[in-house]
A protein has these predicted regions:
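Histidine- and aromatic-rich ligand-binding microenvironments
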Residues: 2-6, 40-41, 100-101, 123, ...
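A generic structural signal for short hydrophobic patches within well-formed alpha-helices
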Residues: 10, 45, 126-127
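Active-site neighborhoods of divalent-metal-dependent phosphate/nucleic-acid chemistry enzymes
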Residues: 75-117
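Acidic, PIN/NYN-like endoribonuclease modules and their adjacent C-terminal/linker elements
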Residues: 108-135
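Short, well-structured N-terminal submotif of metal-dependent ribonuclease cores
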Residues: 1-40, 53-66
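Structured helix-beta-strand junction loops
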Residues: 34-35, 71-72, 129
Length: 135
């Protein structure tokens, strides 16, 4: 199964001090054992790198970014102008009462167009948008 991986899950896996670290490791272990793969967007990757940059410094952030980019179980989708437009029109407009970021909306649009039902995430925005979380 392919699951969408969100920034929070990537951070949790990378930081032993993160409140979700143990849970993230267990979810990732089960997903890998089942032959699972991940997909995500360049926006999520950029958010992750930014968090690592400020939490761990440039060298560690580059190393973690490089490891993700080399990992064959992860596929990264570019944030094309069409994808950004569709995400805004379909998700930010539809859920105007929610605090969804553009990154959230792009995530939902990718999941929708790629027929991905599950997200490896720790925020409930995915459930609000109609998707399931890996558990």
């Amino acid at each position: 199964m392919v699951a969408f991986v969100d920034t929070g899950a990537l951070i949790a896996l990378s930081r032993p001090s993160d409140q979700y670290h143990a849970r993230a490791k267990e979810i990732a272990r089960r997903h890998k054992a089942a032959g699972g793969r991940y997909t995500s967007s360049a926006l999520v990757l950029a958010e992750f790198h930014t968090h690592m940059l400020y939490l761990l410094g440039p060298a560690a952030a580059r190393a973690k970014l490089g490891a993700l980019l080399r990992d064959s179980t992860h596929e990264w989708h570019p944030a094309t102008p069409d994808l950004l437009r569709m995400a805004s029109e379909r998700w930010l407009s539809r859920f105007a009462d929610q605090r969804f970021s553009l990154t959230d909306a792009v995530s939902f649009e990718l999941m929708s167009t790629e027929s991905i039902s599950h997200a490896f995430a720790f925020d409930r925005h995915f459930e609000t948008a109609g998707f399931s979380l890996l558990a």
